């Protein structure tokens, strides 16, 4: 596949949301004590919730994610009933003992000092308010809670296979999001998340031997040391309190281990990179090598999409694979270097999409994962010269279609029939949405669209239609048909060179749309004298044309092709004897499911 993405570097200034848009705001203050031997914790949470909606709210909901790690939970049942369970989960939850399960319970809850009743529904807490929250008003919800860190199975947990003591993600009572669609109260089965934008002030008290890293800026480095300060104040007792503040984020994650090495690196962009990894001689060299490469990735992503808006990013060894969070990622660390670099690149790329653009991941997992895969692949092309960086996404997509497992990308993340369909749709087909869009509107227009999208919708919760509208403005091409067919259906792209006939001084080419999804067609012509040309056939529904491909001087724009008509006839002003080859989509960016009928070779 040819590299068609040429980045036009520019400075991006984050804009404010459009008039009429609203979103809720939350401010968390938490003080938590962790028993590292029993893997239990207790805490207080003061939550200031501001209702910026036009609606009066009579109740609120919290997520209690750790309750999923109990036998017969919805996550457990779903994992044991799906045909292709995640190998990291399988039936492991069902086998957890009482001291291995996870739980997260509210013990008391008050609204502005008034005691509230509440009801736990597995991974959700339902809370009727004593005083309804009217539009524009704020209320303070004060909670005492307790939890137990589950045996490490998926993302969060204790004592991972690599020996990381605490991977603490989705560990606190997290207020559910309320937006123009209403409350988002999906039970947790191990898939995606959605959160309220806000500020976090978190104090974590635990064994002083443990090193802590994660979301937020440490407020007391001299008191804790451990790589945050050259000199550490002497403290009495067996514990330390770590005080973190994270402004304008929608989650808070952390990890801790007594054997963490903590390195820092000042990146060119003014961002401090933190790295936490086990003191394991087998991995230290790779983790040292990772640090300058992460700085290069950060610089590339900044120039490609827009500035990373925080002054810190942290890579932590932990969890069970790789997972993105606010200002940090948790990844497994005992990998080959290409794998360690690759997962770090992908998770860092999420910072622009999963975090700053903050898609509703449950509804639009393909934007969250797919856009990160796309940006990661751009980095592979530019930084490492891997011109085949996009190929795996196309291959995986074609395979899931061939296997008959594809489901529409509009499927809720929890509702896919198979993990294969979810994974391939979210990661691969989501990435192809953007790379194939370069075939439709041109690579420069795609990069321009992403930059404008980031500039206009940072720190909000944009939707697929928001991106479509940005891309239409950037390109001058109508794209409703593209968003509809690629994400809301399983219509496939399949075009065929049906016949090629000599017509004296001309050559007649009959093209056929075999699949259900219409596309513009680039028909490449290779002449026997070595010259090349492209006959560009716009799709009528585009109501516009993309610019000529870079490096192609002979670019002919033909009459557009109406989607409902399966046959299109083209006349080339050259006899067949002068033509060596005809090829649909010479760039390889169109995800045609059958490439065998895309090429005509003139053997005469």
Language model region names:
Residues 15-42, 169, 480-481:
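N-terminal, polar/Ser/Thr-rich
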Residues 25-26, 61-64, 244, 274-512, ...:
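Hydrophobic alpha-helical and helix-loop surface patches within well-folded domains
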Residues 45-47, 64, 137-151, 200-208, ...:
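Short, hydrophobic/aromatic-enriched beta-strand segments in well-ordered soluble domains
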Residues 50, 87-163, 235-236, 560-578, ...:
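A surface-exposed beta-strand-loop module
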Residues 62-114, 169, 205-210, 526-539:
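Solvent-exposed beta-hairpin/edge-strand motifs
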Residues 74-86, 146-200, 588-604:
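Glycine/proline-rich low-complexity spacer/linker segments in large multi-domain proteins
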Residues 174-182, 190-345, 374:
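Hydrophobic helix-coil surface modules that form long, contiguous segments used
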Residues 221, 349, 444, 457-604:
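Non-catalytic accessory/interaction domains
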